[in-house]
Amino acid sequence: MTDKTSLSYKDAGVDIDAGNALVGRIKGVVKKTRRPEVMGGLGGFGALCALPQKYREPVLVSGTDGVGTKLRLAMDLKRHDTIGIDLVAMCVNDLVVQGAEPLFFLDYYATGKLDVDTASAVISGIAEGCLQSGCSLVGGETAEMPGMYHGEDYDVAGFCVGVVEKSEIIDGSKVSDGDVLIALGSSGPHSNGYSLVRKILEVSGCDPQTTELDGKPLADHLLAPTRIYVKSVLELIEKVDVNAIAHLTGGGFWENIPRVLPDNTQAVIDESSWQWPEVFNWLQTAGNVERHEMYRTFNCGVGMIIALPAPEVDKALALLNANGENAWKIGIIKASDSEQRVVIE
């Protein structure tokens, strides 16, 4: 009779002790994100959250997203500390454009082999994003799945729930001829267009860590965390009439602005109102990318566009800039039955 080796989960590639060590490492940063509506702590089967009492007819708004292949670039450059901010930003910015205040956030972290230091850096970034947006990180799933990912590669996804007063939902229905468009400056490419970014790096043979651009490594420009606009926008909509907000993500100007325009309206963007940040000029030149493709793939320095009545413009600009945003008038809304919903001239 032959003795059989006793196998464990760790022998199969799943280290429960590493998972427990990660939970112990992140508890402190997660606790800092806690809102008063959250009941209980980490470790329950489900997270409990009451609705803020200030809402008369609360409507829940939900969203989920990832960070695309920006994650591949972060892994290649071994820079994991800000990718979590990107993850939160992509979700909460989508919520706030509808007037919603983010309440709570959950993350999904999947890897072939759990590296506690890497995962801790990513989740600490998620907690920082939650702090910036005022929402609680109430839980998540860390999945160690040997054979599913190469080496220590990982993927992340985020899920966020917010709340808005039913009568104050921003859906674009009030947008009309003569409305003014205000831009909020971006921090860089945010989390979109990175498959093209990586292709440009490959074709150009450029090392982003040694290539200098505007006084710092190109890598710093490309991995700058997505700007979170939540607190500035929530204060704006509390004090100013806002008719629509577009978050410029995948699809750029051409596809995101029309999502908030009613029929028979057209957004006219004044290209002379701003200068592209240098990283976009570099991408266009190094990749020989056509102008139309730039505006379809990248935000070109504009993270959000807000439509509001002309009399509100000065007040809105003053509020936004006082809150640290780079805000400017970027265009207008015109009545039009043209199929071309956005014009950049």
Curated annotation (Swiss-Prot):
InterPro entries: PurM-like_C_dom, PurM-like_C_sf, PurM-like_N, PurM-like_N_sf, PurM_cligase. It catalyses: 2-formamido-N(1)-(5-O-phospho-beta-D-ribosyl)acetamidine + ATP = 5-amino-1-(5-phospho-beta-D-ribosyl)imidazole + ADP + phosphate + H(+). PANTHER family: TRIFUNCTIONAL PURINE BIOSYNTHETIC PROTEIN ADENOSINE-3, TRIFUNCTIONAL PURINE BIOSYNTHETIC PROTEIN ADENOSINE-3-RELATED. GO terms for molecular function: ATP binding; phosphoribosylamine-glycine ligase activity; phosphoribosylformylglycinamidine cyclo-ligase activity. SUPFAM superfamilies: PurM C-terminal domain-like, PurM N-terminal domain-like. The keyword Ligase applies. It is an enzyme of class 6 (ligase). It comes from the Bacteria. The keyword Cytoplasm applies. Pathway: Purine metabolism; IMP biosynthesis via de novo pathway; 5-amino-1-(5-phospho-D-ribosyl)imidazole from N(2)-formyl-N(1)-(5-phospho-D-ribosyl)glycinamide: step 2/2. It is found in: Cytoplasm. It comes from Escherichia coli O157:H7. Keywords: ATP-binding, Cytoplasm, Ligase, Nucleotide-binding, Purine biosynthesis. Its EC number is 6.3.3.1. This is Phosphoribosylformylglycinamidine cyclo-ligase.
